Amino acid sequence: MPAASPHKTLADVLAYLKANPGKMTFASSGNGSSDHLTAELFWLQTGTSGVHVPYKGGGPVMQDLLGAQVESSFMNINTAMPQIKAGKLRPLVITSARRSTLLPEVPTLEESGVKEANVQSWQAVAGPPGLPADIKTRLRDAILAAVADPATAKRLADMGLE
């Protein structure tokens, strides 16, 4: 939520959604995106509704969220972290099954009373079809070594990646 939002907790949001069905805007990076589907799952599990505002990517979502053109969004933590740290966004919940080590004070959806709505995203490394097995092994080993390196782990955490 934008830091200036009157909604300080998920309970505030739920109360507003129930009192004002179909009024609150939820921005997403596009139809069918993980943030769009997270909002749909949230509405389903809470018996509420909102206005889905699809954008063409996360950049325009952030711009309009910060500019109060839309009221809320579900977004990946690494996208939100710089604005959270700057005090421009207020995280209300984490959608994964457990709290984030990056924002340990922020409760999960389940802790906040929303059951069966755990969502998290992940990143992958892909190669071309037919990549030789020895190259796959070398690539895997290099990635595992990199993420095990404390300096790399810190850089990833600083970018909002766990």
Residue ranges and their predicted role:
Residues Y55, F74-M75, I94, V119:
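Short beta-strand and adjacent tight-turn residues that come in two discontinuous sequence segments
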Residues R155-E162:
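Surface-exposed aromatic
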Residues M1-P60, L109, W122-R155:
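Hinge/capping helix and adjacent helix->loop/strand transition within the periplasmic-binding protein
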